[in-house]
Amino acid sequence: MSEKILEIKDERLSFFTPAGEVKALNGVSFSMNQGDVLGIVGESGSGKSVTAYSIMGLTAYPGRLVGGTVWFNGHQIDKMTEKEFRKIRGNEVSIIFQDPMTSLNPVYTIGNQIVEVILLHTKKTKQEAWARARELLELVGINEPDRRLKQYPHELSGGMRQRVMIAMALAC
């Protein structure tokens, strides 16, 4: 039997606006075992992204979890401080954002952004991090990785930017 790695129980999340409370999630519950693949489908605005962001602890103000629990690997992550969460975010749990152009920083090269993630979550040296970044680009099917590491997000196609996001998620 597989080990349960993620469990969402009766998650409720609201956005508190000047016009009042907007309930974005109301009773979301699911669990995943190691090796599971989960597809969340729904209409635009149905809460798919809000669910993913809440699991990652990335709910933007004025959003707030108002009920339920989020468990990851036996830890109740919805009660973690930002400092505690930062230790697992990107290291044990990652998200691949739908629109890489809004997630990649336009003023830094692809290489700098991947290396930053590696250095933040591993004990690798800068040289080792650059070598790992190159390996990751190859792993996700980006040709000419040495050249791509020096490029900026706007210089890559949408599909290549998405692959860069996948490489960043795999970096740790």
Task: Please report, for each region that a protein language model flagged, where it lies by residue.
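ABC transporter nucleotide-binding domains
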Residues: 1-172
